[in-house]
Amino acid sequence: MIAALMRPPAAGENEERWLERAREAEARGPLGLHTHWTAPDHARPTAGDPAALVREQGDWLRAVGLDVGFFCGGGWYLDEDVAEAVAELGYTDCTATAFKPGYLEPDAAHLQLDEPSWLQLPSGRRLLELPTTHSIGMLARGLLGPFRRQVVHAYFHDTDLLDRRRSAALRVGLGFLGTKRTPSNLEELQRGLRPTKTMSFANSGP
């Protein structure tokens, strides 16, 4: 099942239209927060307090009546304070990846995990981490081999659906994946998955 992790409307964007789309997505499957800190077209933070914006957006989503349960930081950004904010909001995090995005600098804030894990935070909270394991290209390249990870969690952007080639690759990749693994969704994993691995966020940096 597809989960919609959505960026809240930026200044000047049509909030009513956004809410209409978000409620439609919520009716179809799990809903999550996808924060872009700098601008709609610039995901990773360049200034300010990243965790404060996550809390602000999470509070707004709750105030407008949306049932949000997941988070993915734009540009795969996650630091300790953001992780604390995500845990405070009661979300499950999907920002970690099983791969290192090629555009990130070596010292960029990013969490890399192969399998689901609990993140032990300085506050004493634990955050359930369901890492993203595959891009569209990785799904397509893996068709002829086994998917060895406990959970296969692929991501794509809505703009990928407008590209004929990428949309076709996504459909083929998901179709083959469905023949090899048992379909699930993030809410089922959130409720039922209990990872055996717990790690300190302080020891999970790049």
Labelled PLM ranges:
Residues 16-19, 23, 51, 55-62, ...:
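Amphipathic, non-transmembrane alpha-helical secondary structure
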Residues 47-49, 108-113, 196-206:
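Short, surface-exposed amphipathic charged segments that create phosphate/polyanion-binding patches used
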Residues 26, 147-206:
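C-terminal domain-boundary segment and adjacent tail
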Residues 70-154, 158:
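Active-site-adjacent pocket scaffolds in enzyme catalytic domains
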Residues 39-41, 135-139, 190-194:
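A short acidic, often aromatic-flanked loop/helix-cap motif at beta-alpha or helix-coil junctions
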Residues 1-80, 103, 154:
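Metal-dependent polysaccharide deacetylase catalytic core of the NodB/CE4 family, i.e.
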Residues 26-28, 88, 124, 178:
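Short, well-ordered coil/turn elements that cap or connect secondary structure elements
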Residues 1-2, 30-34, 70-73, 85, ...:
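A structural signal for short, well-ordered beta-strand segments and their strand-loop junctions
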